[in-house]
């Protein structure tokens, strides 16, 4: 992800148009109660592959839903599975404890499920148990945080972390360049600094800014939580009396970041968010400090369940010529602004 020549790439989620259309339709036409509608808004249907086939059991493991994006991951996965009469969905207790997640996945292996969808707390630490599943003949769909050993998973699906940074860097770089900014103060608030996905986001951001002759002035991580976002932002605001722009990696922690900015009464800056939460999009629509967010959609969980079902049933993807599901699928990172926010708002998750 470190090659600057990749700045212009645009990754493609196969069937993304179908996914988006299905999600929009669900959001606009559902007669379900509000909570149920939110849980099912990011599901999709399409093609003969959706016709009932061999009955399969799909196991699912993810971290605890301690913030909006992870909560949306779990809801989307379960909602997608409910669409299929041939799928039994077995979700284990979500946890942020590595050893507990390993034990939970081992329980699914012991039950001999037909496929596994795993969003690991940390890819390296869960790699061994994923490999155990693969060696037992259970295909693993690795969601988001990647296992380092490709033999540990059949297919990986996730967001374009480098592309997120690139998108944020281009938005900030273009705006500052248009304003003839010289030596601007650009701050970056990461999620968890030790995660490879965070490092890829930072690399993309730095590479994009460099094309405008800019660089990050200060960087600090905020652990993906509202509380840490508020504390980190407050410290950065005190340390920098002049700020031109902030890129915040995560819209969940962005709730705290925005609160700190508003409390400090700072109007000398603009901010770009990350992931595409509904509350961030509402802030963008209202106008103010938050001008944009770059997507990292939890719809990937819906797609992961669909992919696991196809693999377990020995099917390929209907829109592809190839007979089998691809080894990796990367979602495109899209920039949401006031100009296009109404189109993306139905797909936003609640922080």
List where the protein language model places each region.
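Hydrophobic alpha-helical
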Residues: 118-134, 205, 218, 222-282
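Flexible loop/turn connectors
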Residues: 266, 270-334
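Extracytoplasmic "Venus flytrap"
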Residues: 43-46, 50-76, 80, 84, ...
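Hinge/cleft segment of the Venus flytrap/periplasmic-binding protein
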Residues: 36-56, 189-193, 197, 209, ...
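Bacterial lipoprotein signal-peptidase II cleavage site
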Residues: 28-37
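Flexible loop/hinge segments that line or gate small-molecule binding clefts
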Residues: 124, 128-163, 182-185, 277-285, ...
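N-terminal secretory signal peptides
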Residues: 1-7, 15-26
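Hydrophobic alpha-helical segments within soluble ligand-binding/sensing domains
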Residues: 101, 157-183, 228-230, 276-281, ...
């Amino acid at each position: 992800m470190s090659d600057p020549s990749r700045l212009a790439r645009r990754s493609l989620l196969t069937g993304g148009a179908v996914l988006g259309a299905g999600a929009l339709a669900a959001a606009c036409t559902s007669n379900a109660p509000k909570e149920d509608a939110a849980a099912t808004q990011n599901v999709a249907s399409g093609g003969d592959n959706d016709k009932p086939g061999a009955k399969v059991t799909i196991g699912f493991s993810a971290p605890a839903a301690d913030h909006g994006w992870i909560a949306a991951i779990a809801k989307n996965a379960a909602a997608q599975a409910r669409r299929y009469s041939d799928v039994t969905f077995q979700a284990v207790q979500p946890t942020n404890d590595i050893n507990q997640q390993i034990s939970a996945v081992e329980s699914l292996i012991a039950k001999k499920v037909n496929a596994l969808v795993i969003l690991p707390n940390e890819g390296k630490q869960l790699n061994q148990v994923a490999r155990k599943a693969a060696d037992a003949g259970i295909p693993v769909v690795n969601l988001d945080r990647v296992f380092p050993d490709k033999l540990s998973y059949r297919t990986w699906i996730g967001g374009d972390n480098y592309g997120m940074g690139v998108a944020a860097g281009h938005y900030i770089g273009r705006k500052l360049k248009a304003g003839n900014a010289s030596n601007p103060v650009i701050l970056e608030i990461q999620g968890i600094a030790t995660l490879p996905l965070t490092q890829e986001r930072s690399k993309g951001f730095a590479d994009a800014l460099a094309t405008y002759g800019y660089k990050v002035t200060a960087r600090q991580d905020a652990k993906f939580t509202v509380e840490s976002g508020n504390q980190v932002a407050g410290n950065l605001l005190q340390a920098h009396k002049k700020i031109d722009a902030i890129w915040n990696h995560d819209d969940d922690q962005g709730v705290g970041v925005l609160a700190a900015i508003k409390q400090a009464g700072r109007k000398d800056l603009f901010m770009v968010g990350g992931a595409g939460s509904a509350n961030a999009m509402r802030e963008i629509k209202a106008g103010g400090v938050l001008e944009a967010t770059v997507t990292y959609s939890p719809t990937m969980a819906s797609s992961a369940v669909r992919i696991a079902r196809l693999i377990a049933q020995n099917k390929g993807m209907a829109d592809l010529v190839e007979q089998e599901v691809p080894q990796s699928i990367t979602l495109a990172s899209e920039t949401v602004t006031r100009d296009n926010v109404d189109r993306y708002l139905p797909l936003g998750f609640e922080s």
